[in-house]
Amino acid sequence: MTPPAAVRRNEIIGVLSLAVDFAIGQAVGYGLRSAIGSMAIAREMGCDEALAAESYYQGLLQASGCNAETDVLNALFGDEILLRQDVARIERADPTQMLALVLSHVGAGREGPAPQAFGDAAYSAIMGAANRVFHSHCETASKLAERLGLSSNVQRNLAQTHERWDGAGLPDKLVGTAIALPVRIATVVHHCIRLGGFLPVEDVITRVQSRSGAAYDPAVVDAVLSRLPVLLIDMDDAAAWESAICDFPPDDVSLSEAELDIACEVLADFIDIKSPAIAGHSRAVSALAEAAGQVAKVTAQERALLRRGGLLHDLGYAAIPGPQRLSHAMSEQGRLHPYYAQRLLHRAPGLAPIGTLIAEHHERLDGSGFHRASRGPDLSTLSRLLSAADCYQTLTETRGRREALTPKQAAQTLREDSRAGSLCGQAVAAVLEAAGQTGRRKKVAHVAGLTAREIEILQALARGGANKYIARELELSPKTVDNHIQSIYAKLGVKTRGGATLFALERGLLQPGKT
């Protein structure tokens, strides 16, 4: 194999930003345009280059925590991507607009008709749950930035993403200049670019001016509106990538092999945190695919490609709502997730080989796979190994109403698929041999000073369990569970389930698909 090009940190961050665009229902390149615009406004306002760089990263990653606790949004509102699109069109501080939004979406995640109205208590409970999710988004974005090696200022800024100039924001209800300037800038720039996607310029100006002094810093509003025509110039994602990723920042660095692995883990966790049902899935596929490569005696460079392909194989799911009760149409859209992943990764030359590999991970030798219906001669050894590893791992996880198969049952299913001509027999043999060697069911070591009981509770919490459910599962009182959770949060230095789940993913504490 030809050695791949070096990967720069900002290329990874750019890929994350593009994936976020999918997840929040915005045009691909929205985050890149916001980064360019935020940096330009910071300079226009006389900021030094350090603050301009912070504004760039805030524009790029402001919504990067969006997948945290998506299961809560799914349960309440159904399609979370459609919900995010609609939230972007209203004034969240206006109770009338919020009530109309909630009524139009609530119950969509459940069977039966949506309610036409409900009482204050129900509305309050729904909004309380939504606000907890927003808290999680802020903390998750900050933690992802930390793992990507971005500065403490960038981490702090991302933790303030949902704050408002008038103090009515969250998580800390900061007021005025207590909110970092890059946050104030990127918030207005983001909103202008979103509104510009469906409103004429005059209406964008009216909307933004109506929030001046309330949600937005008036000085920032003035600076942004003075450059609004430039900010709203349409730019396709290729041009936005060239400008935002290739032409920017002096603090960009090339990643070592170890740093690239960590960066790929960040992208994997961004996807897997979307649902307790898949938490840890990408890391498990990665470990199994790499081990299968060892059995198959592929080169060290090819094993690295398998390892990273396993981590990123489901990156395209950023564009797919769910996971619950997908309609037939959405199931068909879900079959495009390998395409979406390849599209994201091919922007960076050093990541393109990973994109090529994972584009084939649902293809089958007999042409029955997706998204291209490729056949055996077109499928590489590595794609065959990754396909078999993903199949085995998925079968051993609980998915929706399907219970997890035992390793023996999963092995039998893979052998049957091989005999039927769907999966490669040699790849299946390598994966099954590797599955007996990886030790993925080993006892979890204590970390961060957590007791064995606290690790149990952390795992249950990361799987989406409510306190009462965890209490029943572990035969504890709800109060005891709550006390343990507060102790866990203190030891981990987090405040939300999203932050705790990221910690558990990073430390390998989760067995995917366990309920």
Can you describe what each PLM-predicted range is?
Residues 62, 313, 483-490, 502:
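Base-recognition residues in the alpha-helical recognition helix of bacterial helix-turn-helix
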Residues 346, 490-505:
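Short, Lys/Arg-enriched C-terminal cap helix and immediately downstream tail that follows
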Residues 34, 157, 188, 454-457, ...:
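Short alpha-helical "packing" element that flanks the helix-turn-helix/winged-helix DNA-binding module
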Residues 3-447:
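Metal-dependent catalytic cores of enzymes that make or break cyclic nucleotides
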Residues 443-482, 491, 507, 511-515:
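Helix-turn-helix DNA-binding segment
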